[in-house]
Amino acid sequence: MMSPMASILMYTHFRMWKHALNVWSITLFQNFRLTAELIILFTLLNFLFLIPVMNVFAFFIHNVVNFSLIIYFSKLYLKVKGNEEEYKREIERTKLAQALKTYLPHAVTLTFATYAMTVAYLILLFVSLLILGLITGITVFTFGTDFIIAYLIFIVLLLILYFWIITSYPVFFARTVIEGQTPRDFFFLFLTAPFSKLLWKLAFSLEVLFSSFVIGFFSLFIFLFQFVMSHLFPPLFFLTYFVAFSNTLLIYLFGVISVSYLLWKREGK
């Protein structure tokens, strides 16, 4: 098994973003049977969304399945200390049922934790709007000429909230997966992740910042590919949920890789 210091040297040689893309592609395509089973699984989940009364339930199930798989692959990555060759061998032995059920309880509690965090963010957004309203006299309930300004403020805050979620959740997830053992751990570690000193160090790592930019660009490309595929090539619509999962997997795997990089670097010293 690769030592922490060897892992650091590997990051230096490959660049973190390249290593993240390698791990991501190994996860999705190294085991052909697993790839086929994942496509079938997300195609079946897609049908749940076609039933109106099942939409809320389908959304919850989709989140739990996503987290079950991503937690499993992340734990596998941590087990081999970032060694790509060992990770390949582990993926080749992986079965879908094993990946789904191993951390299913953890995925359920983590899903509820993300919901709780999102509600907290929405409350923060609402409070921010109230404060802005008191300062400027312009609220989302403003009518007349100030309505456009109020609407723009609301949109800007929503965009800030959205980008905060998609950039912070993978890092919160990483801290949770690295330190958590029980389903209860996963719930509380995720909710307290914003106060973790280790995660704040990511903001001062140039390697992490540069790699996150590259991964973000690649993730945007996947999203655009999914959009084009679903709208211009209807016969391939059944693949869209698998593509969406692959995008989520990339973002969260990178979160795990970047946080573990800092930990292994500290251990190497």
Swiss-Prot record:
Topology in membrane: Multi-pass membrane protein
Localisation: Cell membrane
Residue spans crossing the bilayer: 21-43, 48-70, 121-143, 147-166, 205-227, 242-264
Keyword Nucleotide-binding: no
Keyword Transmembrane helix among record annotations: yes
Keywords for this protein: Cell membrane, Membrane, Transmembrane, Transmembrane helix
GO CC, one annotated term: plasma membrane
Name assigned to this protein: Uncharacterized protein aq_1793
